[in-house]
């Protein structure tokens, strides 16, 4: 390839796969945006508003983050901590942020259930 001076034309198969890939990405984008907006409507007092074109997670800032995470785990909701606490270092971002998954595996009802669980945890626990 170091000596190649021309660019080959994209094959019909590769073009088809590219179009297929782009349609999947578009569907994933719409699902994530819808899920993000739904959680924002229901958890705006806990939301950390991120300026992103392609949200990966809905990030909340909460007290008792680790307890909430364990509670959600009992409901089969697995929330990663992208900013873990570091022993000996106190940081509000590390201690309070929790990432809620919002990808296309989750439906509108799933998002509403997650929001309900989070609000229940803070209203009644």
Residues covered by each model-derived region:
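Generic non-transmembrane alpha-helical segments
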Residues: 38, 42, 67-77, 117-124
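Conserved glycine-rich beta-strand-loop-beta hairpin in the small C-terminal domain of fold type I
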Residues: 7-40, 49-60
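Charged, glycine/proline-rich intrinsically disordered loops and linkers
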Residues: 1-6
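PLP-dependent enzyme catalytic core of the Aspartate aminotransferase-like
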Residues: 74, 87-125
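Conserved PLP-binding catalytic core of the aspartate aminotransferase-like
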Residues: 47-88
């Amino acid at each position: 390839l170091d000596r190649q001076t021309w660019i080959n034309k994209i094959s019909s198969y590769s073009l088809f796969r590219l179009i297929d890939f782009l349609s999947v990405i578009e569907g994933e984008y719409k699902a994530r945006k819808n899920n993000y907006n739904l959680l924002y409507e229901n958890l705006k007092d806990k939301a950390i508003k991120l300026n992103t074109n392609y949200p990966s997670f809905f990030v909340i800032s909460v007290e008792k983050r680790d307890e909430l995470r364990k509670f959600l785990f009992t409901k089969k909701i697995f929330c990663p901590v992208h900013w873990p606490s570091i022993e000996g270092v106190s940081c509000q971002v590390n201690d309070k942020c929790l990432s809620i998954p919002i990808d296309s595996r989750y439906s509108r009802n799933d998002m509403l259930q997650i929001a309900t669980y989070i609000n229940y945890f803070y209203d009644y626990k």
